[in-house]
């Protein structure tokens, strides 16, 4: 490896003349060196080993060295170049060269020997001399067409083969030019790295700036084209490259992985000529040189299966045909995609073998459609940027050292491809795209140099000119071929006049009259006539976006229009290249077209521009002035507004006012005034309203303006139901008898559900009960079954047969997508060619389906459409027949559908057939709806062509049901009585009728000019024969029968009996059902896991089916409480789910409804509706939680058991909601909401004030970035990182979500950081007292999620008394590290945690020594105070909650300032720095142990560093005599030390003391041998039990068995082990407390334990038993003792021992009380310890911490004697038990000092008993158990 590197260096210096360019490109390619070398080695098949090794040696710098040099030494070894260097290097080079030549296999270099056939990419510079054949693969495009301006000039293979290493550069360029495709035949030097580079170029990152950083290039490259080049190394047989092995430096490794191309997609397959693969098969290569597989004869030539591959990072134009063999040789990535493609192909082949020829034909047509799309992707739609190779050194595909002037200046263009989003843009060579798409390049340059760009100086913006009418169409509109119709020119004049008068207006022409063209003409008029160049903003629905784009190109090509849609990356690309001129900072575009959704997502960007014109298509989306879309758009700065809608009035005058208020807020300011003026207008036909509207609204209808439009004739075809439909219809009514019988007392939604079911039944039986698979056999039977299941389909079948014969083309509309599925199946079986458009068909496919149907000579016979899909602007005028299969609630919706065919351009009469099922709800709905439509037409002639509902004057009601309960009841009864007269099973089939007879009976009349709006509306329905006035009177006078008269009793009874049976079954099945649902709920985490979604889905569907018959079913026990559907009217379940998801992202969500609406895509909903839903969720959750808590109080066992921690769930409509997660999120984000200022100016200055731990990201990250991140979360919602990234005000664009996914911070790191910052905020607000009262309670509830173990050590260590505080948290993930870093969730933090834990253990070993003297002195005082402790307890609780305190012997507790935390002022820091200089080396090494150390060695390393540092600090402190000074400087110095590691000062100090103690113990053990242990020196982390004794004497003096011996620990037991007492009596020493020892254990265990049996540090295998230790002892006095145990750094609010139980997840808690309660009840079965045999612990294996031999502890065997202080603790714990048995000796007496354990406990020689107790106090104990 080194040799190769040296060789490269030598060459590098020998090529000094090219140094500058070479270095630049080397940066870009340095990490690719391995791959480069490999490609260059293969560059010259004929040059022999010399050239081979030469290229190899140059490999690492192939990009950087001038190929002219290599040409000179074409066949020479590297030797000559090396001569200039010292001999040793020369020898090494020669040595390497020789080895490469002699043992190519060893180094994987063998390829170099063979002429490696590089895919012959289209060689642009072909005609260049050998020098021009430089090996630099230019960008794929460049490579291909570099110099050769014509595609035709691809060099012959011979020529290519002549390219020796000297000529390899150009060749590489070729290679690079197009997506590298392996071409066996043409040996080409593969410069792998170059493809990458090329990729980088293509990246949209490469801006057209002249000087992109070279070092950025490699990143871009890797990202952009993962390893393209693989495809070029054709003949690689070896898995490893020698180059990679040899040259592997750190970077090389990454690059090596990038050597190969990646398959992105397999597009097609074929049988092709063997070897006709690779670069020669790209589109442009075939155009230039012909298809290598063109003369393939399957009979004579050898063939192979080939696949059309779209390569990752290359555009579609570079797709190549490859065989499996060629792909494997190139070692491409993504072969799994090929396997999947082959599998799918096999399935299709099998299917094609079984189906009829017509099906095969249909399949082939579909394939053709798909391949047409792929061809479209090879067409450049627009060029958006240019760069020359010179400007992007290091990013181009040809080497920077190339001397060729042409390539260095040859431009590359960033191309947007037709039909693909901007994110798919790619850089292409001019030579490649210039040939075919020169017009795109020209238009790009003309746009770039255009002077017609928006400017604020335009006079017309400030002062409108006088209006001059256009008498004829101006020349700038549409050129010579396009002509505006008269009424369109009139419309243009009206728009221009309004603009001159400063009136914003509504263009409300009927659909089909060309509103789009009139608007574009108006913008062109402003552009040309008044030099107003924009910016114009046009907001349109997605469905009409392409037609707007197309019309702009046709009618106003001079206007630079940008279509602003796509994903985040696409929009970023648009803003980077299409937005502003980098020099002038002026906007580039004149008009911007976008959609409502994108407008809301990027409202900050779009809202910052001053728009000269704002146009909104389909403007009835703005009818709700309370919706987010409305509120957002009305705030946009615009000089003129135009609303384009065919339906200005939908449900009420309020909606008309909303539109008027939007365009002219000053004139139509208040709805109340408008209503007062015009609300009563129906008496005079709204004449006053007409007058007011006149200047602001223009509406023409087709029959007024388009005399040439052929007639439209509508016929209603009434059909009978089939026998099966009749059965189903009766069955639906009978099953719902109870709901129906309630009449007006029933629920509207219940009735609507029944109506919908009946409407489905009228359409087709399969909508009610789909057929079983096995019921459907051959095609003919399927067809018959399909047709017989619907009376409408029987008629349609006959109708279509007739229409097909006549050559008509048909549009078939249905509201129900499932009905469209059935019709599609019918048409497929009948082999009628058709297209389909519904909501699921998007974008390009939709557009292509429309184009295909409208194309000249199209064979499509039918077009299936969803009545509401596709927006209004869809033109299907090539059809002349419309079939309305099922009518909408509102027939006007169907008028919109008809207008798709009956519009301008239609030459034939349009026949409309409306199918209605006779005697059913369908017929009645049409009749009633028709009558309700009349009022609408009195205001604006036939304005409602899409109205979902019927006009009601003042109600803003916009739900989709226009009927009230009474009407719904009447509709349901219509026809039912006659139906039930037919006996069950005897339903008659509809009579066979001739289609001509049917059409004759449905009397046909043409549209006539109506005398009134009402007549005109009604004339839409040619139904005079079917619904005469008498019928209507009859309808009104029809006697109202009750349902029990309509539905025969026997059928009702039959259904009731079935229901009863079903209920009985349910009762039997209940336990099973309950357990399964319970399981689903309990095991869910709070996050939206898949299982939860499934549960929600099932519950949603359950509720949908059960809502209507809830009365009939027994309520299931345990079912979540649910909120009725009608309480969330206007929201679907999917919308509610989205709302809840967004609700959890914001603080105080009820005040952030607009943000929630935007996030949940509910912008059409009014704020009132959103608020109603938000309040419903909040209130339901709060009450559910209260109920749950009450239940827990009543029945404590309810909340126990696994899975119960999840808390209650509720159901809102069909959506199941976890109450706890909602409330938790509300609390978490409330703090953020409170801390962010409301004032926008203040908000910009917002900065975190608390100290924040550093974030270890790959970018600079400071407190400002944290503050901006919080601001982003506040503005855009938690988790919406992409929006935060793109918000320019936050300035985080370059910092978060880097494109390289291995860089941080990605989403996961941001989430972790955000969680940490939110916790800091909460702490900060607590401190400030901002949180009071109820909020404090909330915080307590949340606390279980925040561990603050660090507070424990602090009190102990600094104040000498072990003051307990209950644990703050049971959440393992937030232990310890949360306080420091908040990054507890990331894997790195886990490692840090381990390290920290390890060190804590060491620390704790010695942490008692300093305080021992204090403790001993205070014991006697504590004894006196002890009896008061009971009284003190309650008061201390309240005090404790305020924070840690100093406790001194003679005074009240003094609070410790929490902010004395870990920061030093500059002066103190400098002093500390100087004092610690002698141990600088230890400080640096503290957190960086050498790599390769094992666990034990790492531990020793850390311990030694700490000891050096701690000893130095102790030395520094000797200078002080005053205790206060000593404390202060000890603290300062340790804080200084903490800057070198992740741990805080307290932890480090504690770790040092533990290590110090251990050291002194080990020294003592060397001197003394314990006679009990037989001279062995057991490792004892604790010197004695004195720490426990001191604890006992402090906290339980009144119970002490030997009160007269306060210092007893000094002389008992431990002496037996030879630990001198002075260790414990020394004033500066103190012993372990339980908590400390627990920390020590945990730290040791978690640092070195995970799976590692490292003897000295114990094992983590035993924790499963520790849980049982609790069970073996009474803890009656537990609460009393708690106050004196567990470390002092924990929060002191005792009251929160089990705070808010139900709020914690089940793994967060092992409730202490559970154990206490259980074991009190258990006492009968358990013997107290006094009555157990001495070796009980040894026998009871549940209590044993380990059963391994004790060889782990410095090789010592088991100890027969355990330390006597265990018995102290035993005595202490036992004292709540009954009085000691007289026979039992005092635990402190000498006989008792023998350990009850005969075998040594691996847990630091402590009994499981004391460990269990201490661990119960230790916040980390549960953590251990859980983790284990």
Curated annotation (Swiss-Prot):
UniProt GO cellular component terms: chromatin; nucleus
Intracellular or extracellular location(s): Nucleus
Biased segments, Basic residues type: 175-204
Sequence positions that bind ATP: 509-516
CHD1 helical C-terminal domain (CHCT): annotated segments: 1464-1566
Biased composition (Acidic residues): 234-243
Major location (coarse): nucleus
Domain Helicase C-terminal, residue spans: 795-946
Transmembrane segments: none
Domain of life: Eukaryota
Domain Helicase ATP-binding: 496-666
Compositionally biased spans, kind Low complexity: 15-75
Locus of motif DEAH box: 617-620
InterPro entries in the record: CDH1_2_SANT_HL1, CHD1-2/Hrp3_HTH, CHD1-like_C, Chromo-like_dom_sf, Chromo/chromo_shadow_dom, Chromo_domain, Chromodomain_CS, Helicase_ATP-bd
Catalytic reaction list: ATP + H2O = ADP + phosphate + H(+)
Keyword Disulfide bond: no
EC number of this enzyme: 3.6.4.-
Residues modified to Phosphothreonine: 240
Residues in Chromo domain copies: 261-353, 378-456
One term of GO molecular function: RNA binding
Family: Belongs to the SNF2/RAD54 helicase family.
Function according to Swiss-Prot or TrEMBL: ATP-dependent chromatin-remodeling factor that specifically binds to the promoter of target genes, leading to chromatin remodeling, possibly by promoting deposition of histone H3.3. Involved in myogenesis via interaction with MYOD1: binds to myogenic gene regulatory sequences and mediates incorporation of histone H3.3 prior to the onset of myogenic gene expression, promoting their expression.
Notes on the domains: The CHD1 helical C-terminal domain (CHCT) may bind DNA and nucleosomes.
PANTHER family xrefs: CHROMODOMAIN-HELICASE-DNA-BINDING PROTEIN 2, CHROMODOMAIN-HELICASE-DNA-BINDING PROTEIN 3-RELATED-RELATED
Subunit structure: Interacts with MYOD1. Interacts with histone H3.3.
Name under which the protein is recorded: Chromodomain-helicase-DNA-binding protein 2
Gene: CHD2
